[in-house]
Amino acid sequence: AKDLHIRWSLYKNRLFADDNELVATFEDAKAKTTCNSKGQAAIRQTLTVDNVAAWTAEAPNVYVVVGELMQGKKVLETISFQTGFRTVEIKDTPASQDEFGLAGRYYYINGKPVKLKGVNRHDTNPLTGKVISREQMEHEIMLMKRANINHIRTSHYPNDPYFYYLCNKYGIYLESEANIESHEYFYGKASLSHVPEFQAAHVDRVMTMAHQLVNNPSIVIWSLGNEAGPGHNFVVAYDSLKAYDASRPVQYERNNDIVDMGSNQYPSIAWTRDAVKGRMGIKYPFHISEYAHSMGNAVGNLVDYWEAMESTNFFMGGAIWDWIDQSMYNYTKEGKRYLAYGGDFGDTPNDGQFVMNGIIFGDEQPKPQYYEVKKVY
Protein backbone atom coordinates (compact mmCIF):
# COMPACT_ATOMS: atom_id res chain seq x y z
CA ALA A 1 0.00 0.00 0.00
CA LYS A 2 1.10 3.58 -0.53
CA ASP A 3 -0.06 7.12 0.13
CA LEU A 4 -1.11 6.27 3.67
CA HIS A 5 -1.54 8.79 6.46
CA ILE A 6 -3.01 8.93 9.96
CA ARG A 7 -5.95 11.00 11.14
CA TRP A 8 -6.00 11.69 14.86
CA SER A 9 -9.05 12.69 16.88
CA LEU A 10 -9.21 13.67 20.55
CA TYR A 11 -12.39 13.27 22.59
CA LYS A 12 -13.16 14.49 26.11
CA ASN A 13 -15.15 12.10 28.29
CA ARG A 14 -17.80 13.36 30.65
CA LEU A 15 -16.57 13.04 34.23
CA PHE A 16 -17.01 9.47 35.58
CA ALA A 17 -18.67 8.45 32.31
CA ASP A 18 -17.89 7.16 28.81
CA ASP A 19 -19.92 9.51 26.62
CA ASN A 20 -17.75 12.20 25.12
CA GLU A 21 -17.41 15.09 22.73
CA LEU A 22 -14.87 15.84 20.01
CA VAL A 23 -12.17 18.27 21.09
CA ALA A 24 -9.72 18.36 18.20
CA THR A 25 -8.56 16.57 15.05
CA PHE A 26 -5.23 16.41 13.27
CA GLU A 27 -4.65 15.14 9.76
CA ASP A 28 -1.62 15.67 7.55
CA ALA A 29 -2.19 13.85 4.28
CA LYS A 30 1.03 15.27 2.80
CA ALA A 31 3.41 13.90 5.46
CA LYS A 32 5.84 11.33 4.01
CA THR A 33 7.27 8.36 5.92
CA THR A 34 9.35 5.50 4.58
CA CYS A 35 8.70 2.00 5.91
CA ASN A 36 11.43 -0.55 6.56
CA SER A 37 11.67 -3.92 4.83
CA LYS A 38 9.03 -5.31 7.19
CA GLY A 39 6.57 -2.58 6.28
CA GLN A 40 7.04 -0.81 9.61
CA ALA A 41 7.53 2.84 10.42
CA ALA A 42 7.48 4.96 13.58
CA ILE A 43 5.59 8.22 13.26
CA ARG A 44 5.72 11.04 15.79
CA GLN A 45 3.14 13.80 15.47
CA THR A 46 2.26 16.59 17.89
CA LEU A 47 -1.26 17.84 18.55
CA THR A 48 -1.60 21.01 20.60
CA VAL A 49 -4.78 21.26 22.68
CA ASP A 50 -5.81 24.40 24.52
CA ASN A 51 -7.62 24.59 27.86
CA VAL A 52 -7.30 20.92 28.80
CA ALA A 53 -8.89 19.64 31.99
CA ALA A 54 -6.31 18.04 34.26
CA TRP A 55 -6.62 14.45 35.49
CA THR A 56 -6.60 13.88 39.26
CA ALA A 57 -8.06 11.21 41.53
CA GLU A 58 -10.71 13.73 42.63
CA ALA A 59 -11.54 14.95 39.11
CA PRO A 60 -10.43 12.20 36.70
CA ASN A 61 -10.81 14.01 33.39
CA VAL A 62 -10.26 11.31 30.77
CA TYR A 63 -9.58 11.92 27.09
CA VAL A 64 -9.78 9.33 24.32
CA VAL A 65 -7.35 9.36 21.40
CA VAL A 66 -8.54 7.76 18.15
CA GLY A 67 -6.08 7.06 15.36
CA GLU A 68 -7.29 6.11 11.88
CA LEU A 69 -4.98 4.75 9.19
CA MET A 70 -6.18 6.40 6.00
CA GLN A 71 -5.67 5.73 2.30
CA GLY A 72 -7.13 8.80 0.70
CA LYS A 73 -10.50 9.13 2.38
CA LYS A 74 -10.80 5.41 3.14
CA VAL A 75 -10.27 4.19 6.71
CA LEU A 76 -8.13 1.03 6.72
CA GLU A 77 -7.63 0.54 10.45
CA THR A 78 -8.60 2.24 13.71
CA ILE A 79 -7.07 2.24 17.20
CA SER A 80 -8.10 4.10 20.35
CA PHE A 81 -6.86 4.51 23.90
CA GLN A 82 -7.53 6.52 27.03
CA THR A 83 -5.20 9.25 28.15
CA GLY A 84 -5.20 12.27 30.40
CA PHE A 85 -3.34 15.49 31.06
CA ARG A 86 -1.44 15.55 34.34
CA THR A 87 2.12 15.96 35.54
CA VAL A 88 4.03 13.83 38.04
CA GLU A 89 7.32 15.10 39.37
CA ILE A 90 9.80 14.90 42.20
CA LYS A 91 11.61 18.15 42.83
CA ASP A 92 13.73 19.95 45.37
CA THR A 93 11.57 22.54 47.07
CA PRO A 94 12.72 25.55 49.10
CA ALA A 95 11.19 26.11 52.51
CA SER A 96 9.43 29.23 51.24
CA GLN A 97 7.36 27.10 48.83
CA ASP A 98 6.41 24.35 51.28
CA GLU A 99 3.21 24.53 53.32
CA PHE A 100 5.14 23.35 56.40
CA GLY A 101 8.07 25.70 55.83
CA LEU A 102 10.53 22.85 55.29
CA ALA A 103 12.97 22.52 52.41
CA GLY A 104 12.99 19.06 50.89
CA ARG A 105 12.62 16.71 47.96
CA TYR A 106 8.89 16.24 47.45
CA TYR A 107 6.39 14.43 45.22
CA TYR A 108 3.92 16.48 43.18
CA ILE A 109 0.94 15.74 40.94
CA ASN A 110 -0.11 18.70 38.81
CA GLY A 111 2.23 20.89 40.83
CA LYS A 112 0.67 20.06 44.21
CA PRO A 113 1.94 17.73 46.96
CA VAL A 114 -0.28 14.67 47.17
CA LYS A 115 -0.79 12.02 49.85
CA LEU A 116 -1.29 8.50 48.53
CA LYS A 117 -3.77 6.76 50.83
CA GLY A 118 -3.51 3.28 49.52
CA VAL A 119 -3.87 -0.47 49.62
CA ASN A 120 -2.06 -3.36 48.02
CA ARG A 121 -4.41 -5.40 45.88
CA HIS A 122 -4.37 -8.95 44.50
CA ASP A 123 -6.76 -10.38 41.90
CA THR A 124 -8.80 -12.94 43.83
CA ASN A 125 -12.30 -14.41 43.99
CA PRO A 126 -13.42 -17.21 46.34
CA LEU A 127 -15.18 -19.06 43.51
CA THR A 128 -13.02 -18.41 40.45
CA GLY A 129 -9.60 -17.89 42.05
CA LYS A 130 -7.35 -15.52 40.13
CA VAL A 131 -9.94 -14.97 37.39
CA ILE A 132 -12.21 -12.06 38.27
CA SER A 133 -15.04 -10.40 36.42
CA ARG A 134 -15.27 -6.83 35.24
CA GLU A 135 -18.22 -6.39 37.58
CA GLN A 136 -16.06 -7.36 40.55
CA MET A 137 -13.31 -4.97 39.47
CA GLU A 138 -15.77 -2.08 39.36
CA HIS A 139 -17.35 -3.04 42.68
CA GLU A 140 -13.92 -3.06 44.32
CA ILE A 141 -13.14 0.41 42.97
CA MET A 142 -16.49 1.70 44.30
CA LEU A 143 -15.74 0.24 47.74
CA MET A 144 -12.33 1.90 47.72
CA LYS A 145 -13.68 5.31 46.76
CA ARG A 146 -16.26 5.09 49.56
CA ALA A 147 -13.43 4.38 52.01
CA ASN A 148 -11.39 7.43 50.89
CA ILE A 149 -8.77 5.17 49.29
CA ASN A 150 -7.10 7.02 46.42
CA HIS A 151 -4.13 4.72 45.72
CA ILE A 152 -3.46 1.10 44.73
CA ARG A 153 -0.21 -0.79 44.38
CA THR A 154 -0.88 -3.58 41.87
CA SER A 155 0.82 -6.24 43.95
CA HIS A 156 2.69 -7.93 42.42
CA TYR A 157 1.94 -7.84 38.70
CA PRO A 158 0.23 -5.65 36.11
CA ASN A 159 -3.53 -5.99 36.09
CA ASP A 160 -6.10 -6.59 33.39
CA PRO A 161 -6.33 -3.59 31.01
CA TYR A 162 -9.95 -3.09 32.10
CA PHE A 163 -8.81 -2.42 35.65
CA TYR A 164 -6.67 0.48 34.43
CA TYR A 165 -9.66 1.76 32.45
CA LEU A 166 -11.66 1.83 35.69
CA CYS A 167 -8.88 3.59 37.60
CA ASN A 168 -8.62 6.20 34.84
CA LYS A 169 -12.38 6.68 34.85
CA TYR A 170 -13.07 6.86 38.58
CA GLY A 171 -9.78 8.30 39.80
CA ILE A 172 -7.21 6.06 41.51
CA TYR A 173 -3.49 6.82 41.73
CA LEU A 174 -1.73 3.61 40.68
CA GLU A 175 1.67 2.20 41.38
CA SER A 176 1.89 -0.29 38.52
CA GLU A 177 4.22 -3.13 39.45
CA ALA A 178 6.13 -5.44 37.12
CA ASN A 179 5.59 -9.18 37.48
CA ILE A 180 8.90 -9.92 39.18
CA GLU A 181 9.14 -11.64 42.54
CA SER A 182 11.87 -14.13 43.41
CA HIS A 183 12.38 -13.85 47.15
CA GLU A 184 12.66 -17.62 47.59
CA TYR A 185 16.28 -16.97 46.56
CA PHE A 186 16.46 -14.24 49.22
CA TYR A 187 18.66 -11.20 48.69
CA GLY A 188 22.27 -12.38 48.75
CA LYS A 189 24.47 -13.76 46.00
CA ALA A 190 21.87 -16.36 45.01
CA SER A 191 19.30 -13.69 44.14
CA LEU A 192 18.23 -13.80 40.50
CA SER A 193 18.73 -10.04 40.42
CA HIS A 194 22.48 -10.72 40.24
CA VAL A 195 22.45 -13.57 37.70
CA PRO A 196 23.39 -12.36 34.17
CA GLU A 197 21.30 -15.08 32.52
CA PHE A 198 18.18 -13.53 34.07
CA GLN A 199 18.90 -9.93 33.04
CA ALA A 200 16.87 -10.11 29.83
CA ALA A 201 13.90 -11.57 31.72
CA HIS A 202 13.96 -8.73 34.25
CA VAL A 203 14.09 -6.10 31.52
CA ASP A 204 11.42 -7.82 29.45
CA ARG A 205 8.89 -7.95 32.27
CA VAL A 206 9.40 -4.30 33.15
CA MET A 207 9.27 -3.08 29.56
CA THR A 208 6.29 -5.26 28.60
CA MET A 209 4.38 -3.56 31.40
CA ALA A 210 5.45 -0.09 30.28
CA HIS A 211 4.73 -0.65 26.58
CA GLN A 212 1.24 -1.91 27.36
CA LEU A 213 0.23 0.65 29.96
CA VAL A 214 2.15 3.88 29.35
CA ASN A 215 -0.87 5.91 28.20
CA ASN A 216 -2.91 5.42 31.40
CA PRO A 217 -3.06 8.69 33.39
CA SER A 218 -3.87 6.78 36.58
CA ILE A 219 -0.35 5.34 36.71
CA VAL A 220 1.71 7.80 38.74
CA ILE A 221 4.51 5.42 39.84
CA TRP A 222 6.23 2.48 38.17
CA SER A 223 7.47 -0.36 40.38
CA LEU A 224 10.24 -2.68 39.17
CA GLY A 225 8.91 -5.62 41.19
CA ASN A 226 8.59 -7.03 44.68
CA GLU A 227 11.11 -8.62 47.02
CA ALA A 228 13.38 -9.82 44.23
CA GLY A 229 16.84 -8.76 45.37
CA PRO A 230 18.97 -5.64 44.92
CA GLY A 231 21.17 -6.63 41.98
CA HIS A 232 22.40 -5.14 38.72
CA ASN A 233 19.58 -6.66 36.67
CA PHE A 234 17.28 -4.06 38.21
CA VAL A 235 19.72 -1.27 37.32
CA VAL A 236 19.45 -2.29 33.67
CA ALA A 237 15.66 -2.57 33.96
CA TYR A 238 15.45 0.91 35.51
CA ASP A 239 17.63 2.45 32.82
CA SER A 240 15.51 0.85 30.09
CA LEU A 241 12.29 2.05 31.67
CA LYS A 242 13.47 5.64 32.15
CA ALA A 243 14.75 5.79 28.58
CA TYR A 244 11.25 4.88 27.42
CA ASP A 245 9.19 6.92 29.92
CA ALA A 246 10.78 9.66 31.99
CA SER A 247 7.41 11.17 32.96
CA ARG A 248 6.88 9.00 36.06
CA PRO A 249 9.07 8.19 39.07
CA VAL A 250 10.19 4.61 39.63
CA GLN A 251 10.11 2.75 42.94
CA TYR A 252 11.79 -0.47 44.04
CA GLU A 253 11.73 -1.26 47.73
CA ARG A 254 14.72 -3.65 47.70
CA ASN A 255 17.19 -1.06 46.37
CA ASN A 256 16.29 2.58 46.88
CA ASP A 257 19.69 3.71 45.60
CA ILE A 258 18.92 2.83 41.98
CA VAL A 259 15.45 4.42 41.70
CA ASP A 260 13.82 7.83 42.12
CA MET A 261 12.25 7.58 45.57
CA GLY A 262 12.56 5.81 48.90
CA SER A 263 10.37 2.98 50.19
CA ASN A 264 10.29 0.20 52.73
CA GLN A 265 7.94 -2.33 54.30
CA TYR A 266 6.36 -2.45 57.75
CA PRO A 267 8.21 0.35 59.52
CA SER A 268 7.30 0.98 63.13
CA ILE A 269 5.31 4.03 64.14
CA ALA A 270 8.30 5.30 66.12
CA TRP A 271 10.55 5.02 63.05
CA THR A 272 7.95 6.75 60.89
CA ARG A 273 7.62 9.64 63.33
CA ASP A 274 11.35 10.24 63.08
CA ALA A 275 11.62 9.67 59.33
CA VAL A 276 8.90 12.17 58.37
CA LYS A 277 11.05 14.97 59.77
CA GLY A 278 13.27 14.67 56.69
CA ARG A 279 16.52 14.34 58.58
CA MET A 280 17.00 10.57 58.38
CA GLY A 281 19.55 9.11 55.97
CA ILE A 282 16.96 7.74 53.54
CA LYS A 283 15.89 8.75 50.07
CA TYR A 284 13.04 11.24 49.93
CA PRO A 285 10.26 11.47 48.99
CA PHE A 286 9.29 8.28 50.77
CA HIS A 287 6.48 5.77 50.16
CA ILE A 288 5.68 2.87 52.49
CA SER A 289 5.02 0.10 49.98
CA GLU A 290 3.51 -2.23 52.61
CA TYR A 291 2.34 -1.38 56.13
CA ALA A 292 -0.52 -1.94 58.59
CA HIS A 293 -0.63 -5.71 57.98
CA SER A 294 -4.33 -6.39 58.35
CA MET A 295 -4.50 -9.97 59.59
CA GLY A 296 -6.96 -10.51 62.43
CA ASN A 297 -7.90 -7.63 64.71
CA ALA A 298 -5.72 -5.08 62.98
CA VAL A 299 -5.33 -1.48 61.76
CA GLY A 300 -6.21 0.02 65.14
CA ASN A 301 -3.13 2.24 65.15
CA LEU A 302 -3.41 3.45 61.54
CA VAL A 303 -4.14 6.95 62.76
CA ASP A 304 -0.71 7.12 64.40
CA TYR A 305 1.00 6.55 61.04
CA TRP A 306 -1.09 9.22 59.38
CA GLU A 307 -0.68 11.85 62.06
CA ALA A 308 3.04 11.50 61.35
CA MET A 309 2.83 11.37 57.55
CA GLU A 310 0.53 14.37 57.33
CA SER A 311 2.83 16.51 59.47
CA THR A 312 5.27 17.10 56.57
CA ASN A 313 5.58 16.42 52.83
CA PHE A 314 8.59 14.11 53.08
CA PHE A 315 6.30 11.04 52.99
CA MET A 316 3.99 10.56 50.00
CA GLY A 317 1.87 7.98 51.81
CA GLY A 318 1.66 4.22 51.70
CA ALA A 319 -0.26 1.08 50.80
CA ILE A 320 -1.86 -1.14 53.46
CA TRP A 321 -1.28 -4.88 53.24
CA ASP A 322 -3.78 -5.60 51.93
CA TRP A 323 -7.14 -4.99 50.34
CA ILE A 324 -9.01 -8.32 50.09
CA ASP A 325 -8.74 -11.76 51.70
CA GLN A 326 -7.44 -14.42 49.33
CA SER A 327 -9.87 -17.05 50.55
CA MET A 328 -11.64 -19.81 48.64
CA TYR A 329 -15.10 -21.30 49.12
CA ASN A 330 -15.31 -24.67 50.82
CA TYR A 331 -18.27 -26.65 52.14
CA THR A 332 -19.12 -28.26 55.46
CA LYS A 333 -20.42 -31.83 55.64
CA GLU A 334 -23.89 -30.33 55.72
CA GLY A 335 -23.22 -28.51 52.46
CA LYS A 336 -22.93 -25.05 53.96
CA ARG A 337 -20.52 -22.80 52.09
CA TYR A 338 -17.85 -20.83 53.94
CA LEU A 339 -14.73 -18.81 53.21
CA ALA A 340 -11.78 -21.16 53.72
CA TYR A 341 -8.01 -20.83 53.94
CA GLY A 342 -4.90 -22.97 54.30
CA GLY A 343 -5.60 -26.32 55.95
CA ASP A 344 -9.35 -26.25 55.35
CA PHE A 345 -8.94 -28.46 52.29
CA GLY A 346 -6.85 -31.12 54.01
CA ASP A 347 -3.71 -29.62 52.51
CA THR A 348 -0.45 -30.22 54.36
CA PRO A 349 1.76 -28.26 54.76
CA ASN A 350 -0.14 -24.99 54.57
CA ASP A 351 0.18 -21.33 55.53
CA GLY A 352 -2.98 -21.20 57.60
CA GLN A 353 -4.70 -17.83 57.52
CA PHE A 354 -1.69 -15.97 56.19
CA VAL A 355 -3.51 -14.80 53.05
CA MET A 356 -6.44 -13.49 55.10
CA ASN A 357 -5.01 -10.00 55.43
CA GLY A 358 -7.65 -7.91 53.71
CA ILE A 359 -9.74 -5.05 55.02
CA ILE A 360 -12.62 -6.71 53.14
CA PHE A 361 -13.56 -10.39 53.09
CA GLY A 362 -13.02 -12.54 50.01
CA ASP A 363 -16.70 -12.08 49.08
CA GLU A 364 -16.16 -8.28 49.06
CA GLN A 365 -17.99 -7.61 52.31
CA PRO A 366 -16.26 -4.97 54.46
CA LYS A 367 -14.56 -5.95 57.71
CA PRO A 368 -14.32 -3.63 60.74
CA GLN A 369 -10.86 -2.65 59.45
CA TYR A 370 -12.49 -1.17 56.35
CA TYR A 371 -14.35 1.41 58.43
CA GLU A 372 -11.23 2.25 60.43
CA VAL A 373 -9.39 2.91 57.16
CA LYS A 374 -12.28 5.04 55.92
CA LYS A 375 -12.14 7.16 59.07
CA VAL A 376 -8.35 7.66 59.01
CA TYR A 377 -8.02 8.17 55.24
What does each model-identified segment do?
Residues 141-144, 151-361:
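Substrate-binding/catalytic cleft of secreted carbohydrate-active enzymes
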Residues 1-160, 166, 170-171, 205, ...:
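Secreted/periplasmic carbohydrate-active enzymes, especially glycoside hydrolases
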